[in-house]
């Protein structure tokens, strides 16, 4: 059976198709149950995130994976990618390391890969091949991230803003943070904030339901945007990224908030284009305003560093893919070797016991030894002899060449005359 990966991601499919192919909540255990009931798929791990859905499987053909995904999510032809064996291994190593992510080197994907592996194991979908692959994946990803700077320093304006806030305030766990908006940028900021500790998280948005959804994921308090003015003074740090065409935070709002705070400093990050916070806010004492342009300059240096580190990580992955495939091939060859040795040992034990009985019954030793040697020869050579005869009839030259390598001609050896009972040795 072959190792396959079939999937789509942010590079190959728009968000509406990724949503259709996503497996979250109750849909995930149903999907895993369906995979378990698919006889053509021997092992499977289903990785589903907001940016990708990928099915890693051991199966005879990719058609089984394609049919299963089509039944679950409809026609996705033209948006899917498919890799087999070594390229499937390489793809998984790159995904887990963050080299295939929307944000190069982002660390969250490794945890998501581990969750997918753990969930597949809990649903009885893991066998030896996928389990070994994923265990090796975790090791490779850890090494690539440790030995290179591929995950170092923020490369999005949201993560850079959070890092700057953490540096400005020695302890965010003693601070109140206000998020204005509920889109992708604010989601990313909330995710980075939740990795640390924040004393209090407020989330204001024009659509309250979206703020409530974000607050439930990150332990915050949702507010309607109409209450922004009333709560602004509570915030030590403000991140704003709405889709508004005009500023939502004005100079007078911040001046009022500072008075209510007795001019305790406020850190404000305007992550929106067009801007959410009036530029004049930056002229206020104790208000420290950073815009997208301010953050972008720092982020670009970090991105350049990650791209250079990514090349180093790719080299590590190339080496580890080769080693993993070599190990797998060696392991695959062990099974027939074990079978061959077991067959030889069983034959030896059986015929040796027969010889002992013949000696005990008084048969001459020379005759017993001759029968033992003849029996071993017949029994051990019968399977390859039968296979070679079949190969000759079918024109299988590969097997014939393999036999020539396994049983090279012995110089000076003359075949004995064939006895009638040697013509077709039986097991």
Curated annotation (Swiss-Prot):
GO molecular function, one term: NADP binding
Keywords assigned: NADP, Oxidoreductase, Porphyrin biosynthesis
Annotated substrate binding sites: 49-52, 101, 106-108, 112
Biased composition (Basic and acidic residues): 418-427
Record-marked site positions (Important for activity): 91
GO biological process, one term: protoporphyrinogen IX biosynthetic process from glutamate
Gene3D superfamilies: Glutamyl-tRNA reductase, N-terminal domain (3.30.460.30), NAD(P)-binding Rossmann-like Domain (3.40.50.720)
Catalytic activity, as annotated: (S)-4-amino-5-oxopentanoate + tRNA(Glu) + NADP(+) = L-glutamyl-tRNA(Glu) + NADPH + H(+)
Binding site for NADP(+): 181-186
InterPro entries membership: 4pyrrol_synth_GluRdtase, 4pyrrol_synth_GluRdtase_dimer, 4pyrrol_synth_GluRdtase_N, GluRdtase_CS, GluRdtase_dimer_dom_sf, GluRdtase_N_sf, NAD(P)-bd_dom_sf, Shikm_DH/Glu-tRNA_Rdtase
Active site: residue positions: 50 (nucleophile)
EC assignment: 1.2.1.70
Stated family: Belongs to the glutamyl-tRNA reductase family.
NCBIfam families the UniProt entry points to: hemA
Function: Catalyzes the NADPH-dependent reduction of glutamyl-tRNA(Glu) to glutamate 1-semialdehyde (GSA).
Something else known: During catalysis, the active site Cys acts as a nucleophile attacking the alpha-carbonyl group of tRNA-bound glutamate with the formation of a thioester intermediate between enzyme and glutamate, and the concomitant release of tRNA(Glu). The thioester intermediate is finally reduced by direct hydride transfer from NADPH, to form the product GSA.
Protein name, as recorded: Glutamyl-tRNA reductase
Organism: Stenotrophomonas maltophilia (strain K279a)
């Amino acid at each position: 059976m072959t190792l396959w990966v079939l999937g789509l991601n942010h590079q190959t499919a728009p968000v509406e198709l990724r949503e259709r192919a996503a497996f979250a909540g109750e849909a995930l255990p149903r999907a895993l149950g369906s995979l378990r009931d698919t006889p053509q798929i021997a092992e499977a791990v289903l990785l589903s995130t907001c940016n990708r859905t990928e099915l890693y499987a051991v199966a005879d053909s990719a058609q089984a994976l394609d049919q299963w995904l089509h039944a679950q999510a409809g026609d996705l032809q033209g948006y899917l990618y498919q890799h087999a064996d070594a390229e499937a291994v390489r793809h998984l190593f790159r995904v887990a390391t963050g080299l295939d992510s929307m944000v190069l080197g982002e660390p969250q994907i490794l945890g998501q890969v581990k969750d997918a592996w753990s969930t597949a194991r809990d649903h009885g979908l893991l066998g030896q091949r996928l389990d070994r692959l994923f265990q090796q994946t975790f090791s490779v990803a850890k090494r690539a991230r440790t030995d290179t700077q591929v995950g170092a320093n923020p490369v999005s304006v949201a993560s850079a803003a959070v890092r700057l806030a953490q540096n400005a305030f020695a302890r965010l766990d003693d601070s109140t943070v206000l998020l204005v908006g509920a889109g992708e940028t604010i989601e990313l900021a909330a995710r980075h904030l939740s990795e640390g500790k924040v004393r209090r998280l407020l989330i204001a948005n024009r659509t309250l339901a979206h703020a409530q959804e974000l607050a439930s994921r990150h332990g915050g308090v949702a507010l309607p945007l109409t209450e922004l003015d009333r709560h602004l003074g509570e915030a030590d740090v403000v991140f704003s990224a709405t889709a508004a065409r005009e500023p939502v935070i004005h100079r007078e709002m911040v001046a009022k908030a500072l008075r209510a705070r007795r001019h305790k400093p406020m850190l404000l990050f305007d992550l929106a284009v067009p801007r959410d916070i009036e530029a004049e806010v930056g002229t206020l004492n104790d208000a420290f305003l950073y815009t997208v342009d301010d953050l972008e300059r720092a982020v670009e240096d970090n991105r350049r560093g990650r791209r250079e580190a990514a090349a180093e990580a790719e080299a590590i992955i190339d080496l580890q893919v080769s080693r993993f495939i070599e190990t797998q091939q060696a392991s695959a060859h062990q099974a027939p070797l074990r079978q061959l040795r077991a067959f030889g040992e069983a034959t030896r034990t059986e015929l040796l016991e027969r010889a002992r009985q013949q000696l005990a019954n008084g048969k001459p030793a020379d005759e017993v030894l001759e029968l033992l040697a003849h029996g071993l020869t017949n029994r051990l050579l019968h399977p390859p002899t039968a296979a070679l005869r079949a190969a000759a009839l079918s024109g299988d030259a590969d097997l014939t060449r393999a036999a020539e390598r396994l049983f090279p001609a012995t110089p000076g050896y003359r075949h004995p005359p064939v006895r009638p009972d040697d013509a077709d040795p039986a097991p």
